[in-house]
Every structure is written in C-alpha cells, then in structure tokens.
Regions:
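Bacterial N-terminal signal peptides
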Residues: 10-20
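Extracellular and organelle-lumenal recognition/adhesion modules and their flexible linkers in secreted
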Residues: 130-292
Length: 655
C-alpha cells in the first residue's frame, strides 16, 4: 500500500490545486448582455459569445468565467495551460444556476416548422434543388483539365509526386494524384492546398471531398488557415477525426466554424506521417461552402421535448416516419423531419434538437479546468477529445448527452458520453459532477488503434442516474497500458433507465461496462461506490480473462439489482443472490455489501444516505492512500468511524 500512496498523492494534488489562481493571470467574463467589442476583463466589460471565447488568445493561469443564469449555444474549444504557468480555467461567476452550455438548436417556434405532407414537419435545411447550388469557395475543385490553383509542399525528408490524372469519381473528367515516396513524421511535412477565399467569423462551412487510395490508410482532417505566417487557424472543425481512405471512392464531409474574419483563407490537406510511403492518394470534387443560418449542419442525435424526459425517436429513413415524435435527419439537406399530428412547436413548449458536436471539444488539450458549468443537449460527448492530460472536470452537470450518428452515411452508429478521455490520457480528475440521461457512458476512458498510455485518472464523488453505462473502459491493443485508475465514492443509480435505452440496437444498461481490453493493466481501483439497479448487469466484463478480473482492486462497494444477472465476468454470470460465488471465483470485494443502499428519495433525485443505511461507515479508509477531504457537497470525510459508501457522507449521528 505505501507504494500506491506515493504515486497517487501527486494525482490528487493536481486535482486540488488545478484551479488555484495565479498572480499574473487574467480573468475574463462572459455574459449574454455583454459585447465582443468589450475587453472582457470585468463583469461590466463582459464578452458575449463563445466565438470570442474560443478565438481570444489566453495564457496559462487565465480564467474565463460565464455568468450564472445565462446560456450559450455552440461549442467551447478550450486552450491549454502549462505545467509551469498553471491551468486555464473555464468556470462561473455571479449568483444563480450554473451557466448553460447548450449543444442544441431550439425549434420551439411554430414558424420554425414547415408542413411536408403526410403529417411530416421539417425544420432547417434548404430545398433539395438548392443544395448543389450553394457557392463553392474553391477554384478548380474537380481538376477537370489541370491542377491550376492548387499547390503542394514537402519538407522534413518527405517526398511526393503530385499531378492530375484523367478520370475521377463517378466518371468525372479528372482527379488529383498524390504519390508518396517518403511520408515524413509531422502532418505539415506534406501539404496540398489552395487559397484565396474569404471566411466570416461565426459562419459555418461545409467541406466535402471524394477520396480513394491505392492502399487503405487514415487521413488527417484538412484545416482552414491563414495563407501566410503566422499560419493562424481561421476555422475549427466540428468533431475532427481521421478519415478512413480505401481503394474505393468515398465522399467525406466535415463542418467548420470560423473564428476569424479574413480574406486570405487557405484549405490545407496535411498528409505527413499519415500518407504511407508507396501509397497514392486521389482527390476529386472538393467543395467548401458557406452554410446558411437556417441549416442544421450536423446530425440531430436527440430531440428533447419540454426538457425531458420525453424525447424524439430517431429513424434512419424518411419512409420509416409513421409514429408521433419519430424524426429523421436529412444529411444532404441539413434538415430534420418529425412525424406529428400537429405542428411540433404547438404541441410542445420546448423543442431542443441536439446536434452531433462535443459541447466541449478538448482535442489535444492539457492543463485545463472546467468548473461549475452545465452541459446539456449535445448529441456527441459533453467533454470529448483525444490525446489529453492534466484535465480537471469539477462540479459540472451533464444531461441529455449523446445519440448522434458517429460516422454519417450508411454507417449508422450512435454514440455519446458525458466525459470521455480518448486515446493517450493521464493526470485527469472528474469529481463532484452530475450525469443523467446519457446515451452511452457517464464517464469513460477508452482507446483503440494506436498505442495509448492511460494512467492517473480519477473519478470520485460523482452522481450518475439513468445513463446506459455509469463507467465504461477498454484499451487496445495489447501494447497499450492502463494503470492507476480510481473510480471511488460514486453513486450510480438505474443504469439503462434513460431515454436512449429503448432506441439502441444493443440495449445494455450497465454500471461498470468493461469491453475487451488487452492493454497491460495494473493499479485499477473500484472502491466505495453505490451500484443500484441496472437493466442488465451492474458489472459487465464477460470477455475479460479471469486473471484480468482478479487484477482489479474492488472492495467496499454496495450492490443491489433485484432481478437478472447482476455480475457477468469471464463468461460467468451471477445474480445478486449468487454474489458469494462471484466473490469466491474472483477473490474480489471481501468487504462489499449486497443490500439496498437506503437513499433519501430517488424519485426526487435525493441520493443522500438515510439514517440506518448500510453504507454509513462501511467504506474503505482510502485516506490512507490519498487525501479525500470532502464529499459531493463539501462535508468533511469521515464523519464517523470510517468513510461512507457513495458520493455523500452522512453526519456522524447518521448510523
């Protein structure tokens, strides 16, 4: 145990000190009544928009505070702090409820909806005949006769041969050919680009392109940037991800949000390190279009009606719309269609169309703290992005998250987590947060593909209810590593009881969902948690070898699932009544209890422990390993002879 203590103290101190002020730091304020022309340096000089927050350069130690009681729609793209300069904090100021970051488009005005026949109503979009008529901002997009207007660049030992080739996608006259002889090691080592177009701050832009290659690979997403030094990014992609390229022509689409007004835009394909040597890439029909204000630029993954619990039901074809509140997103026309007996906005006072974007996109970010923010109605992740470290998520709310179409096209896979750390991740803390109605997992770290190290990640003192999974984990391949993971003192209620369960192709409902994970694993702690009721399994790891299950450190948890298989591990199912057999097989949880936790009022979302609860003083004194000074509400721990199980600590007289 002493070896754990030395390693873990550093992790927790990161969490405790992450948001401490720095003497030279600046604090910026944001309010609905502010103006982006203001300095932002006082409540009286507050900024107004997320666009300004995302665009303004911040320094390590700075803080951006949103006014309580106000709301913003769109995506927060944080900036990174540094180890020496401190974290950049995104938090709240003033009195009232937490500031809202909404990942949705409101369609609650009857004028938002147009009758489309057969009890169908449409919102957003353009007429199908107009889609192809949107102006293409790029010159020579199809390479019909030559490659004029396009250039290439190679450095860092990379080498490519670029030229036009007759015959492109679907019989078009031509395409561009980029044959790689040496790939280089950094994305900018190979570039293919065009320039000379304008972008407008706050505008939405859609990029489409047809691609194929002589051998499969994953292409980095293109960037929209300044044509010269200092090569500033003019637009941020919404949910950037690598694009799979195969031998067959395929059309890929990306959406960008512009953060600058500029007339010297450059579309840059960065291929160094991803286009393998000996592979030839072909591009055709490259279009960059400014989307109109009325369009819904990304998939609608959920429609929240009157703020829940009722939600729309997603279907994948217009022809399937035949029941009240079913909806379909028209990917080509940027519109949503709803089946309704009457105008939807006359039937419901509030209609929130959750768009497939992370509400907070922290791709490649580090030394960032999010505190006292409410992230609602987003159809991707609440907080998402890969390759992160030194991230703190504290005192935040995440509700009605996920459900968006992950890939688009014919690959109809829905996804969405509350807080996700994807790929390499370390020194991250999620504490005192609330999660409800999440399509996939409330909290997760996961990885697949490249080698990833995931370590020093802590989830503590959180409340979770009505999420498909409370906590999900997997890491692949076997050369990846996972160690020093702590899931402790969380209260997890009713897994699989949320809006998304019945809409899933794989209804699950699990508190702990551990898929196949061959990564090297050690020091994985699951302690002092309440796991109450799950539609299927409170603990699910059927594909894990028994030795991998035994490597977990699990104890002092409270389990209750009245029906069905409560634990499914290593191809062994156990009901609640068979908990002793599970304990004997694995050697885990000698001090865990199997009983109703005795919560105050679950219907009212009051998850405090009642007097006489078996969870009081039944936790492990993890203070021997790390300082956990307080519970979800700040009550000092412990109040009695030992810590309580769950996120709440009862008064000393509670037992």
């Amino acid at each position: 145990m002493p070896s754990h203590r030395v390693r873990f103290l550093g992790v927790i101190m990161v969490g405790l000190l992450a948001c401490a002020p720095v003497a030279v730091a600046a604090t910026y304020y944001v309010a609905n009544a502010g103006s982006d022309d203001n300095s932002g340096l006082s409540p009286q000089e507050a900024w107004a928009s997320l666009t300004q927050v995302n665009a303004h350069p911040l320094a390590p130690g700075d803080a951006v505070l949103f006014k309580r009681g106000d709301a913003w729609r769109g995506q927060l793209v944080p900036q990174s702090g540094s180890e020496g300069g401190g974290y950049i904090t995104y938090g709240a100021y003033g009195e009232g409820p937490k500031p809202l970051l909404l990942g949705s488009i409101a369609k609650d005005n009857p004028d938002d909806w147009a009758a489309a026949g057969d009890k169908l109503w449409s919102a957003g979009g353009v007429a199908p005949a107009d889609v192809s008529g949107i102006e293409n901002l790029l010159v020579n997009p199809g390479f019909d006769t030559d490659a004029q207007g396009w250039s290439s660049h190679a450095e860092g030992g990379a080498k490519v041969a670029v030229g036009r080739e007759a015959g492109g996608v679907e019989g078009s006259p031509g395409a561009i050919r980029i044959a790689c002889e040496a790939s280089g090691s950094e994305p900018h080592h190979i570039q293919f680009y065009t320039s000379g177009f304008a972008v407008e701050r706050g505008g939405m832009y859609r990029l489409t392109m047809a691609v194929r290659a002589s051998a499969p690979f994953e292409m980095y997403p293109p960037v929209i940037m300044k044509s010269g030094a200092p090569w500033t990014r003019y637009a941020h992609p919404r949910n950037p991800h690598n694009m799979p390229v195969t031998a067959e022509w395929a059309v890929h689409t990306m959406t960008f949000g512009a953060v600058e007004d500029a007339g010297d835009g450059r579309l840059n394909f960065v291929l160094g390190g991803c286009l393998p040597a000996g592979v030839t890439l072909y591009l055709d029909n490259i279009r960059l279009e400014r989307l109109g204000a009325g369009l819904i630029p990304r998939d609608v993954g959920n429609i929240i009606l009157n703020h829940g619990p009722r939600c729309g039901v997603k279907v994948w074809n217009r022809e399937d719309l035949d029941q009240q509140d079913e909806y379909w997103y028209d990917e080509a026309g940027f519109a949503v269609y709803v089946y309704s007996e009457t105008n939807p906005a006359e039937r419901y006072e509030s209609i929130e169309c959750a768009v497939r974007d992370h509400i907070i996109n922290q791709q490649n970010r580090h030394h960032v703290c999010y505190e006292n923010l409410a992230c609602l109605y987003g159809a991707a992740h609440g907080v998402g992005g890969g390759s992160t470290h030194h991230i703190v998520v504290r005192g935040c709310d995440f509700g009605y998250i996920g459900g968006g179409d992950q890939m688009g096209g014919d690959r109809t896979v829905r996804f969405g987590n509350g807080v996700e750390f994807w790929g390499p991740a370390h020194d991250c803390l999620v504490e005192r947060c609330r999660f409800w109605e999440v399509y996939d997992a409330a909290m997760t770290h996961q990885s697949s593909g490249g080698v990833a190290a995931q370590y020093n990640i802590v989830y503590q003192n959180n409340l979770v209810w009505n999420c498909e999974y409370s906590f999900e984990y997997w890491n692949r391949p076997e050369t990846s590593t996972t160690h020093h993971i702590w899931f402790i003192n969380n209260t997890c209620i009713n897994a699989g009881h949320g809006w998304g369960h019945a809409q899933r192709p794989d209804p699950s409902g699990r508190h702990l969902c551990f898929y196949t994970s061959p990564a090297q694993q050690s020091e994985f702690y699951i302690l002092n948690n309440v796991f109450y009721e799950a539609k299927k399994n409170a603990f699910y790891a059927p594909s894990w070898p028994l030795e991998q299950v035994k490597s977990l450190v699990m104890d002092h948890n409270c389990w209750y699932q009245a029906e069905g298989t409560m634990v499914a591990v290593s191809e062994h199912p156990f009901t609640m009544a068979e908990f002793a057999a599970y304990r004997a097989l694995t050697g885990l949880e000698p001090h865990s209890i199997v009983a109703a936790p005795g919560l105050a009022n679950m219907d009212a979302l009051d998850f405090r422990l009642t007097p006489g609860s078996p969870c009081i003083d039944a936790g492990w004194a993890v203070e021997a390993l790390y300082p956990r000074p307080a519970d979800f509400t700040g009550v000092p721990v412990p109040q009695g002879n030992a810590p309580d199980i769950g996120a709440y600590e009862s008064p000393a007289s509670g037992k």
